[in-house]
């Protein structure tokens, strides 16, 4: 299995979403996401894919959905039915020269199902209290090691903290979910 990365942004209370959207608008966070995930294979759930404004250029999307048939596949979007198949598919695709890494980008179910298999977490802490209806349990990463932390203040005067965490014991077998 190829190395897995995860990228997520959370507010002060672990919120990651509100009504299937990111509950804040911080261009610096979006620029960071783009820079980190460019030329990568992205694994995501169906609702996360639906929340994107468009297919993200320079990245291949592997979408986990039990309801969308594989006949909807395109050059940039591959539908699969389980996280196990998503990881297997992404591992095969990352061998192509145009893709260098695999990233789990959401939503909550993808994060929870794949966290134990992830080697590296790119976590953005958005220092805001926002409306939310979806939270990520950050205790999933309690045994991980913080290796990088870069704070910044946005044009909107919001503090963002870009962190990188390493999983000391990722599961090396394919997921069974």
Swiss-Prot record:
Protein name: Dihydrofolate reductase type 9
Gene behind the chain: dhfrIX
Source species of the chain: Escherichia coli
GO molecular function: dihydrofolate reductase activity; NADP binding
Additional information: Confers trimethoprim resistance.
Matching PROSITE patterns: DHFR_1 (PS00075), DHFR_2 (PS51330)
Pathway(s) this gene product operates in, as recorded in its UniProt entry: Cofactor biosynthesis; tetrahydrofolate biosynthesis; 5,6,7,8-tetrahydrofolate from 7,8-dihydrofolate: step 1/1
Lineage of producing organism: Bacteria, Pseudomonadati, Pseudomonadota, Gammaproteobacteria, Enterobacterales
Catalytic activity reported: (6S)-5,6,7,8-tetrahydrofolate + NADP(+) = 7,8-dihydrofolate + NADPH + H(+)
UniProt record similarity statement: Belongs to the dihydrofolate reductase family.
EC number(s) on file: 1.5.1.3
């Amino acid at each position: 299995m190829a190395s897995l990365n995860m990228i997520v942004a959370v507010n002060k209370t672990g919120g990651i979403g509100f009504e299937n959207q990111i509950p804040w608008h911080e261009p610096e966070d979006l620029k960071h996401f783009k820079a980190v995930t460019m030329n990568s294979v992205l694994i995501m759930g169906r609702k996360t894919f639906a929340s994107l404004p468009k297919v993200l250029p320079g990245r291949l999307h592997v979408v986990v959905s039990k309801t969308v048939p594989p006949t909807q596949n395109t050059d940039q979007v591959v539908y699969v039915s389980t996280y196990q198949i998503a990881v297997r598919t992404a591992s095969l695709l990352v061998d192509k020269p145009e893709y260098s890494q695999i990233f789990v980008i959401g939503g909550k179910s993808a994060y929870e199902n794949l966290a134990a298999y992830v080697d590296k977490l790119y976590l953005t802490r958005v220092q805001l209290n926002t409306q939310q209806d979806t939270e990520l349990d950050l205790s999933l990463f309690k045994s991980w090691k913080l290796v990088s932390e870069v704070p910044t203040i946005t044009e909107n005067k919001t503090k963002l903290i870009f962190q990188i965490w390493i999983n000391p014991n990722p599961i090396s077998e394919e997921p069974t979910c």
